[in-house]
From Swiss-Prot:
Coiled-coil boundaries: none
Description of the deletion phenotype: Mice are viable but are sterile due to defects in double-strand break repair during gametogenesis. Testes are apoptotic and contain spermatocytes that have persistent DNA damage and unsynapsed chromosomes due to defective homologous recombinatio. Ovaries are characterized by an early block of follicle development, and they later develop tumors.
Residues the entry annotates as binding ATP: 447-454
EC number: 3.6.4.12
GO biological process: DNA damage response; DNA replication; double-strand break repair via homologous recombination; female gamete generation; male gamete generation; protein localization to chromatin; protein stabilization; recombinational interstrand cross-link repair
Lineage of the species this protein comes from: Eukaryota, Metazoa, Chordata, Craniata, Vertebrata
Main localization (coarse): nucleus
Its job: Component of the MCM8-MCM9 complex, a complex involved in the repair of double-stranded DNA breaks (DBSs) and DNA interstrand cross-links (ICLs) by homologous recombination (HR). Required for DNA resection by the MRE11-RAD50-NBN/NBS1 (MRN) complex by recruiting the MRN complex to the repair site and by promoting the complex nuclease activity. Probably by regulating the localization of the MNR complex, indirectly regulates the recruitment of downstream effector RAD51 to DNA damage sites including DBSs and ICLs. The MCM8-MCM9 complex is dispensable for DNA replication and S phase progression.
Name by which UniProt lists this protein: DNA helicase MCM8
Residue ranges constituting the MCM domain according to the UniProt record: 395-602
Length: 833
């Protein structure tokens, strides 16, 4: 009756799939019962003494004398009681026996691997007593140490299954008259949380064969291919079949036949033989983190290739932040190089042992299933500092003035950038039945040159836990999104991540936004759907790009013309402008008090004085006289005044390194929701805006403005590490939104004009021209005269209350558009009758 349980565990569904092949390999012949292997040996006329002299062969009659049933799966050496690995195997066996109940055996069956926490391993008494130098053993001899670890868990699982099978037989009253045979396949030991992390610049030739851990961004992922680790060869002379190992997947032929009497030297590979074993294989390229403090300016970021096998394949996509732990190995730089000297050149790569995905769609199912590999790690000192920052009385003022202290003024613009750094909460991200709603706000800064837009942009990217800074005039469309490249060696297509994918779950700063040309169209999908779709060369895929875009642009002509809309000043489409939550207009208007304080600030900065961080006493005087608009209604103490530093007040800005930790902690652990009062305040403001925009026959206010208000309000609560956004948060956001809208809706006279689309669709004075031409048509039909003098046209415009900055240019534009025809000096003929 033993055959009923052989190779199937104990018959309750656990480890049932271990008899069939997985991962592209063929385990069906390799994991057959041991007596079948003996029959195969006898059929081929093989002797036991000859087998003992061939330690590399998989078939061996010495299995019955080895206490570890999986010895041949992990070691090529012949088993000996004096082996130096026995003590390590026993120590690991004690460790896994004590922790076996903490592991999910079904998960081990599905993956063929087990996760081992390095920190728990070094703290275990059974390990430190028998292997006191476990850190050095794993670092200097990783292959043998991991083999000991794998054999130990193999032995523990084998004993556990045999015990359960025996208990099951006893319960059912069965007796097999002998020992229950259970065959467990190769189990990989995956070590994670390995310390210390090694920077890519420190990986040199001295690291060859060492066990290291690196962290970086995945920039390239290859296709999954089968890798042969054991090939069956048949002797051409006697027909004997042997399984020959192929270390590192390098194809080599056997040197001699295992039959002593045979002298055959010619062998044919048998790829379909049960003794041929293949694994899934994938190659990824890791780039050092852009936000890493160790990076050096002025050089290309370092990259290194990593090989993933078996269950590690398909554990990451381009743009993911991963922690790869593995063994440093070398490969030939150029296989087919014409120069013979290049045969001595090698390239370092990492044979991955574990991959912990910090983010991305694979983060939940990565090797570190319990989310150990988070985006940022916080020490106890960091947590104390974060708690002290949170305890500040006016936290928003402190954070805003710490963002970019060298730039004077622009408090509300800095507040908008700060809110973009913290971001809102993404909705329905894990619900496959709903469309996700983005939580990352986008900010656009438009203004005259020399007002510090680029410096504020660089400061925001520097403070962000994950920030990518690019310049629009040197960036291509594929450099922003994703590139499909072809591998020269294999001919396969591979994806290479661009700036938006590398900035996933972070900030992407784009300077010189107006000089990007046709690259604007590549941002449309990334800014709203927060993904990038690619359809090229038969490859159709989608990559995540959950990033906040902060852009800075200069107007056409070098100076912002308020007579034009934002679209006309930037030569940019309305589809792109409508995706920005906040659009700030920075104007260089002369102001004696402001200029005096600004000059003092610049001189103090150049002198290196500490008090130069005072951003303080700018008083912005708005020139709106009417109080009919909701945009002009201000509270008793507006946010812009609360953010300013009073004269003589000493400020202690937060260092960028600590502020980066604070922002990372808030984004990682705080997920605020709107309170009822906050939602009511936002709804009232939105409905009032809709009412005023409909009153003038235009509708520039859409639901995107309401979603922007919600996102920014959540970011305002997240800044103070609160789980609920209050009405005060909503009022602060409403004031920032008012400041943004005042710049986009104000005309050249400082009046609010809702007929000017916020997103700049169409000419700014188109409705004025239509109204003027309509009046001329009425007069011409009434007087039967379509000839007008220049002074008559000016009088008609005055009666219609049409205000333009330059009436002569206004008439000239109507002449260019074909509405009026110039018949002589100061004489025009109407052409629309």
């Amino acid at each position: 009756m033993s055959g009923a349980y052989r190779g199937r565990g104990f018959g309750r569904g656990r480890f049932q799939s271990w008899k069939r092949g997985r991962g592209g390999g063929n385990f069906s012949g390799r994991w057959r019962e041991r007596e079948n292997r003996v029959d195969l040996n006898e059929a081929s006329g093989k002797h036991a003494s000859a087998q003992a002299s061939q330690p590399l062969l998989q078939q061996s009659t010495l299995d019955q004398f080895i206490p570890y049933k999986g010895w041949k799966l992990y070691f090529s050496e012949v088993y000996s009681n004096n082996s130096p690995f026995i003590e390590k195997i026993q120590a690991f066996e004690k460790f896994f026996t004590r922790h076996i109940d903490l592991y999910d055996k079904d998960e081990i069956e599905r993956k063929g691997s087990i996760l081992v926490d390095f920190k728990e391993l070094t703290k275990a008494d059974e390990i430190t007593n028998l292997i006191p130098d476990i850190e050095n053993a794993l670092r200097d001899a990783p292959e043998k140490t991991l083999a000991c670890m794998g054999l130990a868990i193999h032995q523990v699982l084998t004993k556990d299954l045999e015990r359960h099978a025996a208990e099951l037989q006893a319960q059912e009253g069965l007796s097999n008259g002998g020992e229950t045979m259970v065959n467990v396949p190769h189990i990989y030991a995956r070590v994670y949380n390995y310390e210390p992390l090694t920077h890519l610049k420190n990986i040199r030739a001295t690291c060859y064969g060492k066990y290291i851990s690196i962290r970086g961004t995945v920039v390239r992922v290859s296709n999954i291919k089968p890798l042969c680790t054991n090939m069956a060869f048949q002797c051409a002379a006697c027909g004997e079949i042997q399984s020959f190992p192929l270390p590192d997947g390098k194809y080599t032929l056997p040197t001699k036949c295992p039959v002593p009497a045979c002298r055959g030297r010619s062998f044919a590979p048998l790829r379909s033989s049960p003794l041929t074993v293949t694994l899934d294989w994938q190659l990824i390229k890791i780039q050092e983190l852009m936000s890493d403090a160790q990076r050096e300016a002025g050089r290309i970021p370092r990259t290194i290739e990593c090989e993933l096998v078996h269950d590690l394949v398909d554990s990451c996509v381009p743009g993911d932040t991963v922690t790869v732990t593995g063994i440093v190995k070398v490969s030939n730089s150029e296989e087919g190089s014409r120069n013979k000297n290049d045969k001595c050149m090698f390239l370092l790569y990492i044979e991955a042992n574990s991959v912990s995905n910090s983010k991305g769609p694979k983060a939940q199912t990565a090797e570190d299933g319990c989310k150990h590999g988070t985006l940022m790690e916080f020490s106890l000192k960091d947590l104390y500092a974060i708690r002290e920052i949170q305890a500040e009385e006016n936290l928003l003022k402190l954070v805003v003035n710490s963002l970019c202290p060298v730039i004077f003024g622009h408090e509300l613009v800095k507040a908008g950038l700060t809110l973009a750094l913290f971001g809102g909460s993404q909705k329905y991200a894990d619900d496959k039945n709903r469309i996700p709603i983005r939580g990352d706000p986008h900010v656009l800064i438009v203004g005259d040159p020399g007002l510090g837009k680029s410096q504020m942009l660089q400061a925001a990217c520097n403070v962000a836990p994950r920030g990518v800074y690019v310049c629009g005039n040197t960036t291509t469309s594929s450099g922003l999104t994703v590139t499909l490249s072809k591998d020269s060696s294999s001919g396969d297509f591979a994806l290479e991540a661009g700036a938006l994918v590398l900035g996933d779950q972070g900030i992407c700063g784009i300077d010189e936004f107006d000089k990007m040309g046709n690259q604007h169209q590549a941002l449309l999908e990334a800014m709203e759907q927060q993904s990038i779709s690619l359809a090229k060369a038969g490859v159709v895929c989608s990559l995540p790009a959950r990033t906040s875009i902060i852009a800075a642009a200069n107007p056409v002509g070098g100076h912002y013309n308020k007579a034009r809309t934002v679209s006309e000043n930037l030569k940019m489409g309305s589809a792109l402008l409508s995706r920005f939550d906040l659009v700030f207009i920075l104007l260089d208007t002369p102001n004696e008090q402001h200029d005096h304080l600004l000059s003092e600030h610049v001189i103090a900065i150049r002198a290196g004085k500490q008090k130069a961080v005072s951003s303080a006493t700018v008083t912005r005087v708005l020139s709106q006289d009417s109080n009919t608009s909701v945009l002009e209604v201000v509270s008793e103490k507006p946010l812009s005044e609360r953010l300013k530093v009073a004269p003589g007040e000493q400020t202690d800005p937060i260092p960028h390194q600590l502020l980066r930790k604070y922002i990372g902690y808030a984004r990682q652990y705080v997920h605020p929701r709107l309170s009822t009062d906050a939602a009511q305040a936002l709804q009232d403001f939105y409905l009032e805006l809709r009412k005023q925009s409909q009153r003038v026959g235009s509708s520039p206010i859409t639901t995107r403005q309401l979603e922007s208000l919600i996102r920014l309000t959540e970011a305002r609560a997240r800044l103070e590490l609160r789980e609920e956004a209050t009405r005060e948060d909503a009022e602060d956001i409403i004031e920032i939104m008012k400041h943004s809208m005042l710049g986009t809706y104000s005309d050249e006279f400082g009046n609010l004009d809702f007929e000017r689309s916020q997103h700049g669709s169409g000419m700014s004075n188109r409705s004025t021209a239509k109204r003027f031409i309509s009046a001329l048509n009425s007069i011409a039909e009434r007087t039967y005269n379509n000839i007008f003098q220049y002074h008559q046209l000016r009088q008609i415009a005055k009666e219609l209350n049409i205000q333009v900055a330059d009436f002569e240019n206004f008439i000239g534009s109507l002449n260019d558009q074909g509405y009026l025809l110039k018949k002589g000096p100061k004489i025009y003929q109407l052409q629309t009758m």
